[in-house]
A protein has these predicted regions:
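Active-site-adjacent structural segments surrounding the nucleophilic cysteine of cysteine proteases
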Residues: 1-71
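Intrinsic disorder/low-complexity segments enriched in polar/small residues
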Residues: 12, 23-24, 96, 101-102, ...
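Noncatalytic regulatory segments and standalone regulatory/sensor domains
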Residues: 128-184
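Generic low-complexity segments that are intrinsically disordered, proline-rich and/or Lys/Arg-biased
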Residues: 6, 10, 23, 75-77, ...
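Active-site-adjacent substructure of cysteine-protease-like catalytic cores
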Residues: 94-136
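Solvent-exposed loop/turn segments at secondary-structure junctions
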Residues: 47, 118-119, 142-145
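Papain-like cysteine protease catalytic cores
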Residues: 60-101, 108-109, 116
Length: 184
């Protein structure tokens, strides 16, 4: 029998404060489940606030979003909860639906969140523009926990099935938030 290393939340956070690996949150509960299974929504919301330079504690974000779900049964973050949470903390965000439209809005943004299907699973991820024009993506999938690529490549490789929604913040909105650009 071999000892299996249990991942901890600290291991899932980058040196510049982004949550990069949802798998490290198996000891944390969200909506009655282990957050490594259904935590992508609150993780994306935390990362977006972090990208905008807002003071946010990941556990407080998780607890607040969990409490916003009035129906107390296990499941993922609902879009209405994500919208309500962002309206409170990121009031200048813009929602765009449709694969091409969402990708274009994201390409023109400073930072944001995608709601899409990764494989066959609904998923939220966050992203932030880098100084060279590419984007840094967080918590995409195993092997792509923290990666930098052009938005067009992300679109070609990940926004390929199902409904896509982009929740984006423009450069102007980011400037008002006293942005920290989160470079690698």
């Amino acid at each position: 029998m071999t000892d299996r290393h249990i991942l901890t939340p600290a291991e899932g956070i980058s040196s510049d404060g982004y949550i990069t690996d949802q798998d490290c949150f198996s000891s944390v509960r969200y909506r009655g489940m282990r957050a490594d299974i259904n935590g992508c929504g609150w993780i994306a919301a935390y990362n977006l606030r972090h990208a905008l330079g807002q003071e946010a504690d990941w556990d407080e974000v998780r607890q607040e979003m969990d409490a916003m779900h009035t129906l107390r049964f296990p499941g993922p973050t609902l879009m209405r909860i994500m919208r309500s949470y962002l309206a409170k903390y990121v009031p200048d965000y813009r929602e765009t639906a449709g694969r091409e439209e969402a990708a274009q809005a994201a390409k023109e943004s400073f930072a944001g969140i995608f709601r899409y299907q990764e494989g066959h699973e609904p998923h939220f991820i966050s992203f932030v523009r880098q100084p060279d024009g590419r984007f840094r993506f967080f918590n995409v999938t195993d092997g792509l926990e923290d990666c930098v690529m052009p938005m067009s490549r992300f679109q070609e490789e990940h926004l390929i099935r199902g409904h896509v929604i982009a929740l984006t913040v423009s450069e102007d909105g980011a400037d008002r938030e006293e942005s920290s650009r989160g470079t690698t």
